[in-house]
Amino acid sequence: MFYSFLVSPEHRDYLRFLWYQDNDPNKELIEYRMKAHVFGNSPSPAVATYGLRKCVDGADEDVQKYVCENFYVDDGLISLDSTKEAVDLLKKTQEVLRKQGNLRLHKIVSNSPDVMAAFKKEDLDKEMKSLDLDKDNLPVHTSLGLSWDLSSDVFIFNINFPEKPDTRRRYL
């Protein structure tokens, strides 16, 4: 997603890197400048968040609220009351992001097979593409470090307590 946001020409000097000519270590190093934001660059998440929010300026209020309040970088998590409401919101958001920012809202996951059936296979998360939504049980999905059992619609928390001896210092 970061690659969708261009770096302004006056800032490209700050995003330089060296690479061997023709990818051959025996040849000279060439200096390149990034034209787009890349994964691993510190400001990229903030740029992506800003870009997403800018894309929905002027959109319907529900789309703006979804993107501005329910996204963390490029993951949107929301709970809605009905299948129709979920499908309508996601489709409207897909359309706005595509038109306003040439961004693709995909990797869709839901605890409702009906919601996922409303979208093309390429819009679904990779784990969901191979499922037969009429027959298969929905798997456990992990997003933002949180495990979600789609079948029972519950979150799963895995907590690992370190093995440390009981001492006064530890408790005081």
Where are these regions (language model features)?
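Conserved acidic
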Residues: 1-172
